[in-house]
């Protein structure tokens, strides 16, 4: 079920806006076609302006921007030759008022707010397993599987921020599920199931003297198929 952004704002506020993620799904019965999904427990439509980038990586490690067709509140694109797709999504600024209500306004627009947060979402979809799948690709945030996944067997996942391993990052099925923390080498284990898998991670990005928000939350979703 899909809900409009207006309904989400009225009913759920920023707590769920923060918990939402973006990920890629294949279009049913259309080979090489994909759609960018957004949501938490249910998928939701989103304004095109919030989708900041969809980039495709080929077998040679070359990146290019996808040609996106936005329809029915979701982004669609073709990627017949891509090995990996990277997504960046900015969910705006949400401010908590003294009443406890969240509104989609900046700190400047709601100066009485006690908290203003900018939720950023990243998605990485591994479409084909080859040498590129186990490499990093110079992204600000990235989850890198250290081997091809096998259903039911623990998989080491390297977590990088600006190319460097980071310790203490939550990695799991999602915010509402159990998670593992990355170790001193930036590695956390995840046990995939047969079929389609989502691997979630959460980061905190420091904010100083920003006129629009006091906090930036970063959530990441890695997706792949396992046999």
What is the predicted function of each stretch?
Residues 71-74, 182-195:
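Glycine-centered loop-to-beta-strand initiation motif
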Residues 20-31, 97, 101-155, 177, ...:
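Beta-strand-rich domain onsets/edges
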Residues 65-69, 178-183:
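Short beta-strand segments within Ig-like beta-sandwich modules, predominantly Fibronectin type-III
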Residues 55-63, 169-179:
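Short amphipathic beta-strand segments in non-cytosolic proteins
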Residues 20-77:
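Start-of-domain marker
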Residues 47-51, 163-173:
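Short, ordered, surface-exposed loop/turn motifs in non-cytosolic proteins
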């Amino acid at each position: 079920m899909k809900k409009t952004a207006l309904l989400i704002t009225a009913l759920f506020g920023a707590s769920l806006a923060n918990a939402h993620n973006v990920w890629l799904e294949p279009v049913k019965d259309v080979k090489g076609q994909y759609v960018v999904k957004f949501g938490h427990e249910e998928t939701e439509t989103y304004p095109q302006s919030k989708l900041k980038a969809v980039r495709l990586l080929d077998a040679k490690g070359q990146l290019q921007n996808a040609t996106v067709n936005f329809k029915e509140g979701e982004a669609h694109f073709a990627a017949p030759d891509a090995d990996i797709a990277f997504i960046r999504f900015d969910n705006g600024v949400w401010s908590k008022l003294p009443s406890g209500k969240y509104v989609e306004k900046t700190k400047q627009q709601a100066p009485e707010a006690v908290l203003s947060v900018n939720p950023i979402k990243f998605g990485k979809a591994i479409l084909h397993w080859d040498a590129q799948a186990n490499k990093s690709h110079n992204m600000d945030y990235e989850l890198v599987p250290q081997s091809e996944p096998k259903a039911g067997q623990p998989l080491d996942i390297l977590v990088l921020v600006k190319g460097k391993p980071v310790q203490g990052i939550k990695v799991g099925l999602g915010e509402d599920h159990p998670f593992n923390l990355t170790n001193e080498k930036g590695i956390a284990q995840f046990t995939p199931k047969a079929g389609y898998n989502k691997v979630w991670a959460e980061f905190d990005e420091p904010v100083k003297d920003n006129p629009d928000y006091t906090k930036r939350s970063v959530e990441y979703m890695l997706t792949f198929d396992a046999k």
